Amino acid sequence: LKACGVDGIQDGIGRTGLVATIRGRSTASGSMVGLRADMDALPMAEHNDFAWKSAKSGLMHACGHDGHTAMLVGAARYLAATRNFDGTAVLIFQPGEEGLAGARVMMEDGLFERFPVQSIYAMHNWPSMKAGTVGLNSGAMMAAADRITIEVTARGGHGAHPYQAVDVVLVAAHITTAVQSIVARNLRALD
């Protein structure tokens, strides 16, 4: 990033996150726009012999994260070289996407207090798109994972008298089936 000519680099945000800033030809608008990419190394061995192979045994940038990071470095190089925009570009290199906590940890560490961006654009590869094209959408575009906890509590009973109790296992099974069918039967997975 230093070689790209960015104006500032702050590392250690959320422990291992990094943010680079690039000022446009003018900053009169005061706008700050974020570009974000994930940069997780995953705990798996890399069994290839490429020049860019991971230097850390048992860790590799799988799942396209190396591509995401490379795209954001490419954006940094272009934006720093041209500066053909008004405001400040904030390049967010986010760790911990796979663990679902990297963004939260960066925010808790003051990411948006230090860099009060008006909008953020996430970058993600999409192998089925034609090379050299960009996919855009108004609103949500990619799927996301989330975790929920549902606790089922009921009046227990004896196995010989199930009619006198509420079978929490059966209730939980029905909830599981109903929640699974929301996406599988009622919504498109990409909505």
Regions found by a protein language model. Name each.
Residues 1-61, 70-85:
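Acidic/His- and Gly-rich active-site-bordering loop/insert found
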Residues 18, 42-44, 48-60, 66-67, ...:
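Histidine/acidic-residue-rich, glycine-tolerant segments that coordinate divalent metal ions
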